Swiss-Prot record:
It is found in: Plastid, Chloroplast stroma; Plastid, Chloroplast thylakoid membrane. It comes from Arabidopsis thaliana. PANTHER family: CELL DIVISION PROTEIN FTSY HOMOLOG, CHLOROPLASTIC (PTHR43134:SF7), SIGNAL RECOGNITION PARTICLE RECEPTOR SUBUNIT ALPHA (PTHR43134). Signal recognition particle receptor protein. Binds GTP specifically. The GTPase activity is inhibited by the N-terminus of the protein until binding to the thylakoid membrane. Activates the GTPase activity of FFC/cpSRP54 when bound to the cpSRP complex. Required for light-harvesting chlorophyll a/b-binding protein (LHCP) integration into thylakoids. Might be also functionally linked to the Sec translocation machinery. This is Cell division protein FtsY homolog, chloroplastic. Belongs to the GTP-binding SRP family.
Amino acid sequence: MATSSAHLSFLAGRISPFSSERIGLFPLRGEFRPRMTRFRCSAGPSGFFTRLGRLIKEKAKSDVEKVFSGFSKTRENLAVIDELLLFWNLAETDRVLDELEEALLVSDFGPKITVRIVERLREDIMSGKLKSGSEIKDALKESVLEMLAKKNSKTELQLGFRKPAVIMIVGVNGGGKTTSLGKLAHRLKNEGTKVLMAAGDTFRAAASDQLEIWAERTGCEIVVAEGDKAKAATVLSKAVKRGKEEGYDVVLCDTSGRLHTNYSLMEELIACKKAVGKIVSGAPNEILLVLDGNTGLNMLPQAREFNEVVGITGLILTKLDGSARGGCVVSVVEELGIPVKFIGVGEAVEDLQPFDPEAFVNAIFS
């Protein structure tokens, strides 16, 4: 599979100079042999930059393949589009677009988004702008990509310049919230970030134990509740204070899973948000809502409610590798205007991937 330069440049920016030794790029002694020529200085085939470039390419290819594999079920649903467009002709436009519309609906693009996409294609076909099946396919992909890559929609984490940056992880029960936090910690740690975890889920008895396992697994420090009746806001406040005093880069704050209809628990999130903001001005930098990809369009009411209460800055969509409803990604971004930051495309610790709109579109419309 070809790996785009965008993927390579993105990944190059994600490799921290502090993590080079950990990923096997050092020591350099005896290996880095620059060759001077009249025009340039280049590294030998076994040198640092050669190995760094190879590592970046391999990592980029691996990440793209994971995303491609993760959306296999959605891609199967949408494969009918290729069949429809293979022998497309103008006389069959209405039939083809009706079946294309059905394929998008089955994949949970939602009625509003689906109608908008199909009617735009119809208009371009009838005006003569689109004259072949391949042109229609390209226009379909471009239309979806435009919805995902809106202006001012930042898919990267916005961590600001004050340390520590604070990231709150919120969501309903069973969405993969604590697991996503652990995987995010693993990713940040491997990039050379000093990470502190905060076990703010004081409602579920096993939550703290689960996060402690993730802390041990990722090599991160953790702050847990003192006593059975500790308040979540107190735990998070204590963690952010420690993060500030001990020079941590990021504090990842777990919170109790809650139904979006439970007002008292939603109020607790407001208290948590205020508590961390008192320690570090502008915190939390990110409030990430974890949503189960298997719920499809049913995630929209959850996202709306959480957003109204605490102001969601980004989404983590989990369990998409087992879902045929990948179109919900487009719906939630387009209807709520909240960017997807990460997607879960597998059970492995490395399978929480930064969301790349172009890679996503290529994965569902192969």
